[in-house]
């Protein structure tokens, strides 16, 4: 077998700019809605009480992808990242492996990109940004929104150093949770182990990107807050079983007809924001088609000589 290119964390981020990631993720959501891309269900394997593993496949545009990724929320106390893993991209024509990529960077970049895609489709305009949770994914949500023309912003994190560093990078301000929630576009990017948005925090015209609750039992918004919003998600089956909407669905407060998939809005097949005073909530559980969009862009960058890769022989 020929040598296989491998992109590490820094190489992935050098290969794909925030604006390219945004465009690629937007296109992937539309293509999936139109049944041009395929995505079997995500598989979870619990590793209690520490975290979980996920296997995420997708196929589109002649490529097939499998992401093997983890979520171990307690890792930072041991100096380890919460999310780690590997992405394998293969040819969907002959099955040959084409590239291996660091899953942490791919996940962070597509998570940030979908925050900007959702804001463009659902927010009232390119206004101020509140970031609640300034870890890797929160930082990339902020960077992608800034690249798309949003801001200025307020960065909040229980770790002041994280909020201060991100705010300094973007020339935004560190602030409290309440200050972040007063912004026009609010991104919640926490582990999803405690509520950070209550019904009383909602204001007319607010758009919420809920990016942290990416598995069963996780929530960043109270059921009352969720029930008060116009609801959107990345993909219904995944969001209804392991996302921000799950608790409200299980309580019988939210049903399928209340939730619109973002791809349908982007394709022009469903309405977006009901009105300027509405509060919109986008539940992002993270899709393999988004990983494929970013990985395909990175593969293209390597083939065109815009990024260097390590190589391995299998």
Feature annotation, model-predicted:
Residues 133-135:
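Glycine-rich Rossmann-fold phosphate-binding loop(s) that bind the pyrophosphate
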Residues 138-139:
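N-terminal Rossmann-fold NAD(P) dinucleotide-binding loop
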Residues 129-130, 280:
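Conserved beta-strand elements of the Class I
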Residues 122-129, 150, 203-204:
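Short helix-loop-beta connector
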Residues 1-107, 116, 289, 299-300, ...:
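N-terminal ligand-binding/catalytic initiation module
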Residues 148-169:
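NAD(P)-binding Rossmann-fold cofactor-contacting core
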Residues 171-253:
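Rossmann-like adenosine-cofactor binding region
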């Amino acid at each position: 077998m020929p040598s296989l290119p491998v992109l590490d964390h820094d190489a992935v981020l050098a290969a794909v700019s925030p604006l390219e990631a945004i465009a690629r993720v937007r296109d992937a959501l539309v293509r999936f809605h139109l049944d041009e891309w395929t995505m079997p269900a995500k598989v979870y394997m619990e590793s209690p009480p520490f975290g979980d593993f996920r296997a995420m496949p997708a196929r589109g545009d002649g490529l097939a992808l499998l992401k093997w990724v983890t979520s171990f929320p307690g890792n930072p106390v041991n100096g380890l990242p919460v999310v780690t893993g590997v992405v394998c991209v293969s040819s969907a024509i002959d099955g040959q492996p084409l590239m291996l990529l660091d899953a942490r960077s791919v996940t962070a970049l597509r998570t940030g990109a979908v925050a900007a895609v959702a804001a463009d489709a659902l927010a009232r305009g390119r206004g101020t940004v509140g970031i609640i949770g300034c870890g890797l994914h929160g930082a990339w949500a902020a960077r992608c929104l800034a690249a798309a023309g949003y801001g200025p912003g307020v960065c909040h994190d229980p770790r002041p150093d994280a909020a201060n560093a991100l705010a300094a990078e973007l020339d935004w301000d560190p602030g409290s949770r309440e200050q972040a929630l007063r912004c026009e576009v609010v991104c919640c990017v926490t582990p999803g182990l405690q509520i950070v948005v209550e019904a009383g925090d909602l204001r007319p015209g607010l758009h919420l990107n809920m990016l942290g609750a990416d598995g069963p039992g996780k929530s960043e918004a109270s059921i009352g807050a969720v029930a008060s919003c116009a609801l959107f998600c990345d993909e219904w089956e995944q969001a209804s079983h392991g996302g921000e909407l799950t608790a409200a669905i299980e309580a019988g407060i939210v049903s399928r007809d209340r939730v619109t998939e973002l791809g349908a809005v982007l394709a022009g097949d469903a309405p977006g924001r009901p009105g300027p005073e509405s509060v919109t909530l986008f539940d992002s559980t993270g899709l393999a088609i988004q990983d494929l969009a970013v990985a395909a862009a990175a593969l293209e960058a390597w083939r065109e000589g815009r990024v260097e890769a390590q190589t391995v022989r299998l």
